[in-house]
Amino acid sequence: MTGSTLLRAIVAAGVLALTGSLVQAQDKTFKLALQNPKGHPLVTGAEKFAELVAAKSGGKIKVSVFPGGTLGGDAQTVSASQGGTIEFVLLNSGILASQVKDFEVYDFPFMFANAKEADTVVDGPFGQKLHGKLADKGLVGLAYFELGFRNMTNSKRPITTVDDIAGLKLRVIPNAINVDWVKALGANPTPLAFPELYAALEQKAVDGQENPLSVILANKFFEVQKHLALTNHQYNPQSLIFSKKVWDTLSPGDRKILQDAAAEASKFQRQVNRDKAAGDLDQLKKNGMQVTELSAAELAKFRDKMKPVIAKHSEVVGADTVKALEAELSKLRK
């Protein structure tokens, strides 16, 4: 190699190295899609996550939050994340059963008795293992936020017994177990994407729906629903997922920033959600909702009606996953 050839090679190598470092240093902007409107605790948590990412990256990574289903429903945004056009999606973990059947276990009625149980399970080996299964589907599970415990609303009548639910046309999350448990109560399930729900309630296409108090308040369902029954029949963790297609292009340092920010933001969001719950109920009452509760005996009837549904879907989810979750809960309840 001549001196001039060597010099050209050294210069070329230097240019390549510089180009690589510049690409590495380029600012990144990622989109985060979710269904609830601004002001909801999930959006507050997403905004906190964006703040943490910006702080931890020195402003090199920006997360733009798109609330209110503005980028599409959950099915659309998950598909877009797999394709790399939407990087983050924050959604009900049970909806991911369309990708990995094990996630349906999160929609089992009355699975978690309280928030502490839920935290221990989702933050522990069980929850992390389920998130790990998303990689084969083009997604990376980063952390669990929460929607919380679900309650029923309707425009027809107060619910004080399980029999009062029979005959109601209830919107459900579009997956099999939610259809089945509503049928088990003698009601008529209507699967609808969340952005369609308010209009369906307003137009009386459905009689009611079920969601945590925070969702009922933030989406102003009190404008189109008169009756609220505090059933706490299902706890919903929310998965913050990221496009694996994009993840595979990130440096280890950038990945760690996102992982650390997600873990911190998830704990922040859960606490915000829980601190807000009592105030949400008061606000719903002030906005005219009539609130009822089921007695212990009626809740026992509700649980009994869910047993065949849980048995059926345990076969769908798989015995190993169900047994692993039950083992975790058994340890917590000793």
What are these language model-derived features?
Residues 26-117, 125-128, 132-334:
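N-terminal secretory/targeting leader peptides
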Residues 14-17, 332:
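Short, flexible helical or helix-coil boundary motifs
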